[in-house]
Protein backbone atom coordinates (compact mmCIF):
# COMPACT_ATOMS: atom_id res chain seq x y z
CA UNK A 1 0.00 0.00 0.00
CA UNK A 2 1.01 3.63 -0.47
CA UNK A 3 1.04 4.22 3.29
CA UNK A 4 3.41 1.31 3.86
CA UNK A 5 5.69 2.44 1.03
CA UNK A 6 5.92 5.96 2.43
CA UNK A 7 7.09 4.50 5.75
CA UNK A 8 10.11 2.84 4.12
CA UNK A 9 13.38 4.69 4.84
CA UNK A 10 15.27 5.93 1.77
CA UNK A 11 17.93 3.44 0.66
CA UNK A 12 21.59 4.00 0.01
CA UNK A 13 21.68 2.91 -3.64
CA UNK A 14 25.40 2.06 -3.39
CA UNK A 15 25.60 0.15 -0.10
CA UNK A 16 29.13 -0.67 0.94
CA UNK A 17 30.14 -4.35 1.01
CA UNK A 18 31.72 -5.31 4.34
CA UNK A 19 31.77 -9.12 4.04
CA UNK A 20 33.00 -11.02 0.99
CA UNK A 21 35.04 -13.89 2.44
CA UNK A 22 34.37 -17.31 3.95
CA UNK A 23 32.98 -17.39 7.51
CA UNK A 24 34.34 -20.26 9.62
CA UNK A 25 34.60 -20.39 13.43
CA UNK A 26 33.32 -16.79 13.69
CA UNK A 27 36.31 -15.60 11.62
CA UNK A 28 36.74 -14.43 8.04
CA UNK A 29 39.02 -16.42 5.71
CA UNK A 30 40.12 -16.31 2.10
CA UNK A 31 39.51 -19.48 0.10
CA UNK A 32 42.21 -22.12 0.57
CA UNK A 33 42.82 -21.81 -3.20
CA UNK A 34 42.83 -17.97 -2.90
CA UNK A 35 40.30 -17.98 -5.78
CA UNK A 36 37.52 -15.37 -6.02
CA UNK A 37 34.49 -14.88 -8.25
CA UNK A 38 32.54 -11.74 -9.19
CA UNK A 39 29.01 -10.98 -7.98
CA UNK A 40 27.07 -8.81 -10.41
CA UNK A 41 24.44 -6.06 -10.13
CA UNK A 42 21.66 -7.43 -12.38
CA UNK A 43 20.28 -3.93 -13.02
CA UNK A 44 23.46 -2.94 -14.86
CA UNK A 45 25.43 -6.13 -15.50
CA UNK A 46 28.38 -4.54 -13.67
CA UNK A 47 30.50 -6.31 -11.07
CA UNK A 48 29.74 -5.26 -7.47
CA UNK A 49 32.81 -6.94 -5.96
CA UNK A 50 34.85 -10.13 -5.84
CA UNK A 51 33.88 -12.85 -3.35
CA UNK A 52 36.01 -15.69 -1.96
CA UNK A 53 35.27 -18.88 -3.90
CA UNK A 54 34.87 -21.75 -1.47
CA UNK A 55 35.49 -25.31 -2.65
CA UNK A 56 35.87 -28.77 -1.14
CA UNK A 57 38.86 -27.76 1.03
CA UNK A 58 36.91 -24.85 2.54
CA UNK A 59 33.85 -27.03 3.13
CA UNK A 60 36.10 -29.54 4.92
CA UNK A 61 37.40 -26.75 7.19
CA UNK A 62 33.85 -25.56 7.89
CA UNK A 63 32.62 -29.08 8.70
CA UNK A 64 35.56 -29.58 11.11
CA UNK A 65 34.68 -26.31 12.87
CA UNK A 66 31.01 -27.28 13.08
CA UNK A 67 31.83 -30.76 14.38
CA UNK A 68 34.08 -29.27 17.08
CA UNK A 69 31.30 -26.88 18.14
CA UNK A 70 28.95 -29.87 18.45
CA UNK A 71 31.20 -32.01 20.69
CA UNK A 72 29.71 -33.22 23.98
CA UNK A 73 30.45 -30.68 26.70
CA UNK A 74 30.89 -27.80 24.23
CA UNK A 75 29.40 -24.39 25.10
CA UNK A 76 26.70 -24.92 22.45
CA UNK A 77 25.75 -28.44 23.63
CA UNK A 78 25.73 -27.31 27.28
CA UNK A 79 23.68 -24.17 26.62
CA UNK A 80 20.15 -23.99 28.04
CA UNK A 81 17.52 -24.33 25.31
CA UNK A 82 16.00 -21.03 26.45
CA UNK A 83 19.35 -19.34 25.82
CA UNK A 84 19.41 -20.66 22.26
CA UNK A 85 16.08 -18.88 21.90
CA UNK A 86 17.57 -15.69 23.34
CA UNK A 87 20.42 -15.81 20.81
CA UNK A 88 17.96 -16.20 17.92
CA UNK A 89 15.95 -13.25 19.23
CA UNK A 90 19.15 -11.24 19.54
CA UNK A 91 20.04 -12.09 15.94
CA UNK A 92 16.60 -10.90 14.82
CA UNK A 93 17.10 -7.64 16.74
CA UNK A 94 20.45 -7.04 15.01
CA UNK A 95 18.96 -7.74 11.58
CA UNK A 96 16.17 -5.29 12.42
CA UNK A 97 18.75 -2.69 13.47
CA UNK A 98 20.46 -3.06 10.08
CA UNK A 99 17.25 -3.59 8.10
CA UNK A 100 17.66 -0.59 5.77
CA UNK A 101 21.22 -1.58 4.88
CA UNK A 102 20.35 -5.25 4.35
CA UNK A 103 17.32 -4.42 2.18
CA UNK A 104 19.47 -2.15 -0.02
CA UNK A 105 22.22 -4.77 -0.29
CA UNK A 106 19.64 -7.44 -1.22
CA UNK A 107 18.29 -5.18 -3.97
CA UNK A 108 21.78 -4.38 -5.27
CA UNK A 109 22.80 -8.05 -5.47
CA UNK A 110 19.48 -9.70 -6.41
CA UNK A 111 17.61 -6.97 -8.31
CA UNK A 112 14.29 -7.17 -6.45
CA UNK A 113 12.57 -3.83 -5.73
CA UNK A 114 13.94 -2.22 -2.56
CA UNK A 115 10.46 -1.55 -1.18
CA UNK A 116 9.75 -5.30 -1.42
CA UNK A 117 13.14 -6.20 0.12
CA UNK A 118 12.36 -3.92 3.05
CA UNK A 119 8.64 -4.59 3.59
CA UNK A 120 8.33 -8.25 2.57
CA UNK A 121 11.65 -10.12 2.73
CA UNK A 122 13.08 -8.46 5.84
CA UNK A 123 9.72 -8.56 7.62
CA UNK A 124 9.43 -12.31 7.03
CA UNK A 125 13.07 -12.90 8.06
CA UNK A 126 12.41 -11.27 11.44
CA UNK A 127 9.15 -13.14 11.96
CA UNK A 128 10.74 -16.48 11.08
CA UNK A 129 13.70 -16.09 13.44
CA UNK A 130 11.49 -14.86 16.30
CA UNK A 131 9.02 -17.68 15.73
CA UNK A 132 11.75 -20.32 16.00
CA UNK A 133 13.34 -18.53 18.96
CA UNK A 134 10.10 -19.25 20.80
CA UNK A 135 10.28 -22.97 19.98
CA UNK A 136 13.80 -23.47 21.37
CA UNK A 137 12.65 -24.69 24.81
CA UNK A 138 9.21 -26.00 23.79
CA UNK A 139 9.95 -28.85 21.38
CA UNK A 140 10.58 -31.88 23.53
CA UNK A 141 9.90 -35.55 24.10
CA UNK A 142 7.27 -37.51 26.03
CA UNK A 143 7.08 -40.12 28.77
CA UNK A 144 5.50 -43.33 27.51
CA UNK A 145 3.53 -45.98 29.48
CA UNK A 146 5.39 -49.05 28.18
CA UNK A 147 4.31 -52.57 29.31
CA UNK A 148 6.22 -54.21 32.16
CA UNK A 149 8.40 -52.78 34.93
CA UNK A 150 10.00 -50.15 32.76
CA UNK A 151 10.05 -46.39 32.40
CA UNK A 152 10.30 -45.09 28.83
CA UNK A 153 10.75 -41.59 27.48
CA UNK A 154 11.85 -39.82 24.30
CA UNK A 155 14.36 -37.05 23.72
CA UNK A 156 14.38 -34.73 20.72
CA UNK A 157 18.09 -34.48 19.98
CA UNK A 158 19.75 -32.28 17.34
CA UNK A 159 20.77 -34.15 14.17
CA UNK A 160 24.27 -32.62 14.26
CA UNK A 161 26.14 -30.98 11.39
CA UNK A 162 23.57 -29.64 8.93
CA UNK A 163 24.58 -28.71 5.41
CA UNK A 164 22.26 -26.01 4.12
CA UNK A 165 22.29 -24.88 0.49
CA UNK A 166 20.22 -21.79 -0.25
CA UNK A 167 19.05 -20.19 -3.52
CA UNK A 168 19.32 -16.72 -5.03
CA UNK A 169 15.65 -15.76 -5.31
CA UNK A 170 15.09 -14.94 -1.60
CA UNK A 171 18.64 -14.98 -0.19
CA UNK A 172 17.96 -13.54 3.28
CA UNK A 173 14.59 -15.22 3.70
CA UNK A 174 15.83 -18.68 2.72
CA UNK A 175 18.76 -18.21 5.10
CA UNK A 176 16.28 -17.52 7.92
CA UNK A 177 14.04 -20.47 6.97
CA UNK A 178 17.10 -22.73 7.26
CA UNK A 179 18.86 -21.23 10.30
CA UNK A 180 15.75 -20.78 12.47
CA UNK A 181 14.74 -24.41 13.02
CA UNK A 182 18.32 -25.74 12.87
CA UNK A 183 19.59 -23.44 15.63
CA UNK A 184 16.44 -23.59 17.77
CA UNK A 185 16.92 -27.36 18.04
CA UNK A 186 20.65 -27.11 18.82
CA UNK A 187 22.27 -28.11 15.52
CA UNK A 188 25.40 -26.67 13.91
CA UNK A 189 25.41 -25.41 10.34
CA UNK A 190 27.59 -25.31 7.22
CA UNK A 191 25.73 -23.09 4.76
CA UNK A 192 26.50 -22.66 1.06
CA UNK A 193 25.08 -19.41 -0.32
CA UNK A 194 24.17 -18.92 -3.98
CA UNK A 195 26.99 -17.53 -6.11
CA UNK A 196 24.61 -14.98 -7.69
CA UNK A 197 23.64 -13.42 -4.33
CA UNK A 198 26.21 -14.07 -1.58
CA UNK A 199 26.39 -10.62 -0.01
CA UNK A 200 23.44 -10.37 2.41
CA UNK A 201 23.89 -13.85 3.89
CA UNK A 202 27.58 -13.09 4.52
CA UNK A 203 26.70 -9.84 6.27
CA UNK A 204 24.31 -11.79 8.52
CA UNK A 205 27.29 -13.99 9.46
CA UNK A 206 28.81 -10.93 11.13
CA UNK A 207 25.57 -10.43 13.07
CA UNK A 208 25.59 -14.10 14.14
CA UNK A 209 28.98 -13.47 15.72
CA UNK A 210 27.81 -10.17 17.25
CA UNK A 211 24.72 -11.89 18.71
CA UNK A 212 27.00 -14.23 20.66
CA UNK A 213 26.66 -17.60 18.92
CA UNK A 214 29.73 -19.69 19.83
CA UNK A 215 32.42 -20.16 17.13
CA UNK A 216 31.69 -22.96 14.68
CA UNK A 217 27.93 -23.07 15.28
CA UNK A 218 27.25 -21.31 11.95
CA UNK A 219 29.76 -21.40 9.08
CA UNK A 220 29.02 -19.83 5.70
CA UNK A 221 30.82 -20.73 2.48
CA UNK A 222 30.14 -18.80 -0.74
CA UNK A 223 30.81 -20.82 -3.86
CA UNK A 224 29.42 -22.84 -6.74
CA UNK A 225 27.10 -25.84 -6.69
CA UNK A 226 29.29 -28.36 -8.54
CA UNK A 227 32.20 -27.68 -6.16
CA UNK A 228 31.12 -26.33 -2.75
CA UNK A 229 27.53 -27.61 -2.93
CA UNK A 230 28.58 -31.07 -4.08
CA UNK A 231 31.19 -31.25 -1.30
CA UNK A 232 28.48 -30.68 1.32
CA UNK A 233 26.03 -33.17 -0.22
CA UNK A 234 28.62 -35.96 -0.44
CA UNK A 235 30.49 -35.19 2.82
CA UNK A 236 30.88 -38.18 5.14
CA UNK A 237 30.75 -36.02 8.28
CA UNK A 238 27.63 -33.99 7.44
CA UNK A 239 24.56 -35.50 9.14
CA UNK A 240 21.87 -33.76 7.13
CA UNK A 241 21.51 -31.65 4.00
CA UNK A 242 18.70 -29.18 3.31
CA UNK A 243 18.50 -27.75 -0.19
CA UNK A 244 16.27 -25.17 -1.83
CA UNK A 245 16.64 -24.85 -5.59
CA UNK A 246 15.88 -26.60 -8.86
CA UNK A 247 14.48 -30.12 -9.15
CA UNK A 248 17.39 -30.95 -11.46
CA UNK A 249 19.93 -30.22 -8.68
CA UNK A 250 17.62 -31.85 -6.11
CA UNK A 251 18.19 -35.18 -7.90
CA UNK A 252 21.97 -34.70 -7.58
CA UNK A 253 21.75 -33.87 -3.86
CA UNK A 254 19.65 -36.95 -3.09
CA UNK A 255 22.00 -39.20 -5.09
CA UNK A 256 25.07 -37.72 -3.35
CA UNK A 257 23.46 -38.22 0.07
CA UNK A 258 22.57 -41.80 -0.77
CA UNK A 259 25.98 -42.70 -2.15
CA UNK A 260 27.85 -41.17 0.81
CA UNK A 261 26.69 -41.59 4.42
CA UNK A 262 22.89 -41.70 3.87
CA UNK A 263 22.60 -38.26 5.45
CA UNK A 264 19.06 -37.01 6.04
CA UNK A 265 17.71 -34.95 3.12
CA UNK A 266 15.07 -32.25 2.86
CA UNK A 267 14.41 -30.68 -0.52
CA UNK A 268 12.36 -27.65 -1.55
CA UNK A 269 12.40 -27.75 -5.33
CA UNK A 270 10.66 -26.39 -8.40
CA UNK A 271 7.01 -26.06 -9.26
CA UNK A 272 4.48 -25.43 -11.99
CA UNK A 273 1.65 -24.46 -9.71
CA UNK A 274 -1.92 -24.32 -11.04
CA UNK A 275 -4.01 -21.26 -10.23
CA UNK A 276 -7.66 -22.08 -10.93
CA UNK A 277 -10.09 -19.26 -11.66
CA UNK A 278 -13.71 -20.45 -11.44
CA UNK A 279 -16.37 -18.49 -13.32
CA UNK A 280 -17.97 -17.29 -10.06
CA UNK A 281 -14.73 -15.72 -8.74
CA UNK A 282 -14.54 -12.03 -7.82
CA UNK A 283 -13.02 -10.95 -11.15
CA UNK A 284 -11.21 -7.79 -9.95
CA UNK A 285 -9.53 -9.70 -7.14
CA UNK A 286 -8.79 -12.82 -9.24
CA UNK A 287 -7.10 -10.79 -12.00
CA UNK A 288 -4.91 -8.87 -9.54
CA UNK A 289 -4.02 -11.95 -7.49
CA UNK A 290 -3.26 -14.09 -10.55
CA UNK A 291 -0.98 -11.30 -11.79
CA UNK A 292 0.75 -11.16 -8.40
CA UNK A 293 0.92 -14.99 -8.22
CA UNK A 294 3.02 -15.10 -11.38
CA UNK A 295 4.92 -11.80 -11.57
CA UNK A 296 5.92 -11.34 -7.91
CA UNK A 297 9.72 -11.37 -7.46
CA UNK A 298 10.24 -11.08 -11.25
CA UNK A 299 8.52 -14.46 -11.61
CA UNK A 300 11.37 -16.06 -9.64
CA UNK A 301 9.25 -18.03 -7.16
CA UNK A 302 9.28 -21.81 -6.88
CA UNK A 303 5.58 -21.64 -6.00
CA UNK A 304 4.59 -19.10 -8.70
CA UNK A 305 1.08 -19.57 -10.11
CA UNK A 306 2.52 -20.42 -13.50
CA UNK A 307 -0.45 -22.27 -15.01
CA UNK A 308 -3.47 -19.99 -14.80
CA UNK A 309 -6.54 -22.14 -15.56
CA UNK A 310 -9.60 -20.02 -16.34
CA UNK A 311 -13.15 -21.36 -16.73
CA UNK A 312 -14.37 -20.85 -20.29
CA UNK A 313 -17.28 -18.47 -19.65
CA UNK A 314 -14.98 -15.86 -18.05
CA UNK A 315 -11.87 -16.71 -20.09
CA UNK A 316 -12.04 -13.85 -22.61
CA UNK A 317 -12.68 -11.20 -19.97
CA UNK A 318 -9.96 -12.58 -17.70
CA UNK A 319 -7.40 -12.67 -20.51
CA UNK A 320 -8.18 -9.12 -21.63
CA UNK A 321 -7.89 -7.76 -18.09
CA UNK A 322 -4.73 -9.76 -17.31
CA UNK A 323 -3.03 -8.39 -20.43
CA UNK A 324 -4.00 -4.83 -19.46
CA UNK A 325 -2.60 -5.41 -15.94
CA UNK A 326 0.66 -6.85 -17.31
CA UNK A 327 1.07 -3.89 -19.67
CA UNK A 328 0.67 -1.47 -16.75
CA UNK A 329 3.31 -3.24 -14.62
CA UNK A 330 6.15 -0.82 -13.87
CA UNK A 331 9.54 -2.31 -14.78
CA UNK A 332 12.67 -0.36 -13.92
CA UNK A 333 15.29 0.69 -11.38
CA UNK A 334 14.62 -1.46 -8.30
CA UNK A 335 15.62 1.43 -6.02
CA UNK A 336 12.74 3.56 -7.38
CA UNK A 337 9.74 3.21 -5.05
CA UNK A 338 7.33 3.12 -8.03
CA UNK A 339 9.02 0.07 -9.55
CA UNK A 340 7.05 -3.18 -9.39
CA UNK A 341 9.53 -5.35 -11.30
CA UNK A 342 13.31 -5.31 -11.36
CA UNK A 343 15.74 -7.36 -13.47
CA UNK A 344 16.11 -11.14 -13.54
CA UNK A 345 18.97 -12.30 -11.34
CA UNK A 346 21.63 -12.90 -14.01
CA UNK A 347 22.37 -13.30 -17.70
CA UNK A 348 21.89 -17.08 -17.62
CA UNK A 349 18.33 -16.73 -16.33
CA UNK A 350 17.65 -13.82 -18.69
CA UNK A 351 18.62 -15.89 -21.75
CA UNK A 352 16.81 -18.99 -20.51
CA UNK A 353 13.53 -17.08 -20.06
CA UNK A 354 13.79 -15.47 -23.51
CA UNK A 355 14.34 -18.99 -24.87
CA UNK A 356 11.11 -20.19 -23.23
CA UNK A 357 9.22 -17.23 -24.72
CA UNK A 358 10.52 -18.19 -28.17
CA UNK A 359 9.45 -21.81 -27.63
CA UNK A 360 5.94 -20.68 -26.63
CA UNK A 361 5.61 -18.76 -29.88
CA UNK A 362 6.98 -21.65 -31.94
CA UNK A 363 4.58 -24.14 -30.32
CA UNK A 364 1.58 -21.98 -31.15
CA UNK A 365 0.69 -20.18 -27.92
CA UNK A 366 -0.72 -16.69 -28.48
CA UNK A 367 1.73 -13.97 -27.35
CA UNK A 368 -0.58 -11.23 -26.04
CA UNK A 369 1.98 -8.79 -24.63
CA UNK A 370 5.68 -8.50 -23.80
CA UNK A 371 7.99 -11.12 -25.19
CA UNK A 372 11.37 -9.39 -25.14
CA UNK A 373 14.01 -7.54 -23.17
CA UNK A 374 12.72 -4.43 -21.38
CA UNK A 375 15.95 -2.37 -21.34
CA UNK A 376 19.20 -2.01 -23.26
CA UNK A 377 21.31 -2.98 -20.24
CA UNK A 378 20.77 -5.18 -17.23
CA UNK A 379 18.60 -8.30 -17.27
CA UNK A 380 15.11 -6.79 -17.54
CA UNK A 381 12.31 -8.70 -19.31
CA UNK A 382 8.93 -7.29 -20.35
CA UNK A 383 5.93 -8.68 -18.45
CA UNK A 384 4.74 -11.35 -20.90
CA UNK A 385 1.35 -13.07 -21.24
CA UNK A 386 0.53 -16.10 -23.37
CA UNK A 387 -3.09 -17.09 -24.09
CA UNK A 388 -4.55 -20.25 -25.63
CA UNK A 389 -1.82 -22.31 -23.96
CA UNK A 390 -2.19 -26.10 -24.30
CA UNK A 391 -1.10 -28.61 -21.66
CA UNK A 392 1.47 -30.26 -23.93
CA UNK A 393 3.43 -27.07 -24.67
CA UNK A 394 6.87 -26.68 -23.11
CA UNK A 395 5.81 -23.41 -21.43
CA UNK A 396 2.91 -25.28 -19.76
CA UNK A 397 5.11 -28.08 -18.41
CA UNK A 398 8.50 -26.62 -17.50
CA UNK A 399 9.36 -24.09 -14.81
CA UNK A 400 10.24 -20.81 -16.57
CA UNK A 401 11.15 -18.83 -13.42
CA UNK A 402 10.48 -15.48 -15.07
CA UNK A 403 7.75 -12.90 -15.80
CA UNK A 404 5.87 -15.09 -18.30
CA UNK A 405 2.20 -15.89 -17.64
CA UNK A 406 0.45 -18.90 -19.21
CA UNK A 407 -3.37 -18.78 -19.42
CA UNK A 408 -5.23 -22.02 -20.14
CA UNK A 409 -8.99 -22.55 -20.69
CA UNK A 410 -11.08 -25.25 -18.99
CA UNK A 411 -14.76 -26.26 -18.88
CA UNK A 412 -15.54 -28.38 -15.82
CA UNK A 413 -14.16 -28.74 -12.32
CA UNK A 414 -13.42 -32.47 -12.88
CA UNK A 415 -11.45 -31.66 -16.03
CA UNK A 416 -9.35 -28.98 -14.33
CA UNK A 417 -8.42 -31.28 -11.42
CA UNK A 418 -7.03 -33.87 -13.82
CA UNK A 419 -5.11 -31.28 -15.81
CA UNK A 420 -3.82 -29.43 -12.75
CA UNK A 421 -2.53 -32.67 -11.21
CA UNK A 422 -0.98 -33.88 -14.47
CA UNK A 423 2.44 -32.47 -13.61
CA UNK A 424 5.61 -33.87 -12.09
CA UNK A 425 5.46 -30.98 -9.63
CA UNK A 426 3.24 -30.45 -6.58
CA UNK A 427 4.42 -27.44 -4.62
CA UNK A 428 1.38 -25.17 -4.49
CA UNK A 429 -2.03 -24.52 -6.04
CA UNK A 430 -4.74 -21.91 -5.72
CA UNK A 431 -8.47 -21.61 -6.31
CA UNK A 432 -10.54 -18.48 -6.81
CA UNK A 433 -14.25 -19.07 -6.22
CA UNK A 434 -17.12 -17.85 -4.04
CA UNK A 435 -18.55 -21.38 -3.83
CA UNK A 436 -17.58 -23.13 -0.60
CA UNK A 437 -18.27 -26.58 -2.04
CA UNK A 438 -15.93 -25.99 -4.99
CA UNK A 439 -13.24 -24.58 -2.69
CA UNK A 440 -13.44 -27.57 -0.35
CA UNK A 441 -13.54 -30.10 -3.17
CA UNK A 442 -10.54 -28.60 -4.96
CA UNK A 443 -8.47 -28.08 -1.82
CA UNK A 444 -8.68 -31.84 -1.19
CA UNK A 445 -8.32 -32.94 -4.83
CA UNK A 446 -5.23 -30.92 -5.76
CA UNK A 447 -1.86 -32.65 -5.28
CA UNK A 448 0.13 -29.84 -3.69
CA UNK A 449 1.83 -29.05 -0.40
CA UNK A 450 -0.04 -25.73 -0.12
CA UNK A 451 -3.45 -24.77 -1.50
CA UNK A 452 -4.44 -21.12 -1.34
CA UNK A 453 -8.15 -20.26 -1.55
CA UNK A 454 -8.98 -16.75 -2.81
CA UNK A 455 -5.40 -15.60 -2.15
CA UNK A 456 -1.86 -16.40 -3.27
CA UNK A 457 1.65 -16.45 -1.81
CA UNK A 458 0.36 -16.03 1.74
CA UNK A 459 3.08 -17.31 4.05
CA UNK A 460 3.34 -17.38 7.82
CA UNK A 461 6.22 -18.65 9.92
CA UNK A 462 3.55 -20.72 11.71
CA UNK A 463 2.37 -22.64 8.59
CA UNK A 464 4.44 -25.37 6.95
CA UNK A 465 5.52 -25.23 3.31
CA UNK A 466 6.84 -27.96 1.05
CA UNK A 467 6.23 -30.11 -1.98
CA UNK A 468 4.45 -33.20 -3.17
CA UNK A 469 6.02 -35.31 -5.94
CA UNK A 470 9.13 -33.79 -7.57
CA UNK A 471 8.68 -30.46 -5.79
CA UNK A 472 10.60 -31.90 -2.87
CA UNK A 473 10.37 -33.71 0.44
CA UNK A 474 10.02 -32.53 4.01
CA UNK A 475 8.44 -29.34 5.30
CA UNK A 476 9.83 -25.97 6.34
CA UNK A 477 8.25 -23.47 8.76
CA UNK A 478 5.78 -24.17 11.54
CA UNK A 479 6.21 -26.87 14.17
CA UNK A 480 6.53 -29.36 11.28
CA UNK A 481 9.74 -27.60 10.23
CA UNK A 482 11.48 -28.75 13.43
CA UNK A 483 11.10 -32.46 12.64
CA UNK A 484 13.81 -32.51 9.98
CA UNK A 485 16.33 -31.10 12.46
CA UNK A 486 15.81 -33.58 15.29
CA UNK A 487 16.41 -37.25 15.95
CA UNK A 488 13.96 -38.95 18.30
CA UNK A 489 15.76 -41.09 20.88
CA UNK A 490 13.89 -43.60 23.02
CA UNK A 491 15.33 -44.21 26.51
CA UNK A 492 13.92 -47.20 28.43
CA UNK A 493 14.88 -47.87 32.07
CA UNK A 494 14.26 -50.94 34.24
CA UNK A 495 12.42 -49.98 37.43
CA UNK A 496 11.80 -52.17 40.54
CA UNK A 497 8.03 -51.74 40.32
CA UNK A 498 5.89 -49.76 37.95
CA UNK A 499 2.80 -48.03 39.27
CA UNK A 500 0.20 -46.15 37.23
UniProtKB/Swiss-Prot annotation:
Q: What is this protein called?
A: Aldehyde dehydrogenase, mitochondrial
- Name the top EC class: oxidoreductase
Identify the coding gene: ALDH2
Please give the pathway this protein is involved in: Alcohol metabolism; ethanol degradation; acetate from ethanol: step 2/2
One Pfam assignment: Aldedh
**Active site positions:** 268, 302
Q: Which reaction does it catalyse?
A: an aldehyde + NAD(+) + H2O = a carboxylate + NADH + 2 H(+)
Site Transition state stabilizer: which residues?
A: 169
Subunit (UniProt): Homotetramer.
Q: Which residues bind NAD(+)?
A: 245-250
Which CDD domains does the UniProt record give?
ALDH_F1AB_F2_RALDH1
Where is the protein localized?
Mitochondrion matrix
What task does this protein carry out? Required for clearance of cellular formaldehyde, a cytotoxic and carcinogenic metabolite that induces DNA damage.
Q: Which UniProt keywords apply?
A: Acetylation, Mitochondrion, NAD, Oxidoreductase, Ubl conjugation
A GO molecular function term, named singly, is: phenylacetaldehyde dehydrogenase (NAD+) activity
Q: Which organism is it from?
A: Mesocricetus auratus
The answer to whether UniProt assigns keyword NADP to this entry is no
Query: PROSITE patterns, from UniProt?
Result: ALDEHYDE_DEHYDR_CYS, ALDEHYDE_DEHYDR_GLU
Q: What is the superkingdom listed in this entry's lineage?
A: Eukaryota
E.C. no: 1.2.1.3
Family named by the database record: Belongs to the aldehyde dehydrogenase family.
GO annotations of cellular component type: mitochondrial matrix; mitochondrion
Q: Which residues form a coiled coil?
A: none
N6-acetyllysine modification sites are: 35, 56, 61, 142, 351, 358, 366, 390, 409, 411, 424, 434
Spell out the InterPro entries in the cross-references.
Ald_DH/histidinol_DH, Ald_DH_C, Ald_DH_CS_CYS, Ald_DH_CS_GLU, Ald_DH_N, Aldehyde_DH_dom
How does the record describe the protein's post-translational processing? In response to mitochondrial stress, the precursor protein is ubiquitinated by the SIFI complex in the cytoplasm before mitochondrial import, leading to its degradation. Within the SIFI complex, UBR4 initiates ubiquitin chain that are further elongated or branched by KCMF1.
Amino acid sequence: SAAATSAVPAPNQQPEVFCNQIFINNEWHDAVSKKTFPTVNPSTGEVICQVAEGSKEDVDKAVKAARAAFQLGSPWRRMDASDRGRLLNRLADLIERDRTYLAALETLDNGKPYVISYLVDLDMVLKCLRYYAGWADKYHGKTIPIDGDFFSYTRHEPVGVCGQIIPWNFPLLMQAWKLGPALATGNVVVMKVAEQTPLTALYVANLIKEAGFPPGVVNIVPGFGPTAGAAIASHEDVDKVAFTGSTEVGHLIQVAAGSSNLKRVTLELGGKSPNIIMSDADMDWAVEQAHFALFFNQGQCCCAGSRTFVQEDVYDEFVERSVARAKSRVVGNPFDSRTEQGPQVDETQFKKILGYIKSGQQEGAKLLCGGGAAADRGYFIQPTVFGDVKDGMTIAKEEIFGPVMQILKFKTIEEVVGRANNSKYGLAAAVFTKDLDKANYLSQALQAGTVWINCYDVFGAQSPFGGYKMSGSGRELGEYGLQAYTEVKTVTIKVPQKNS
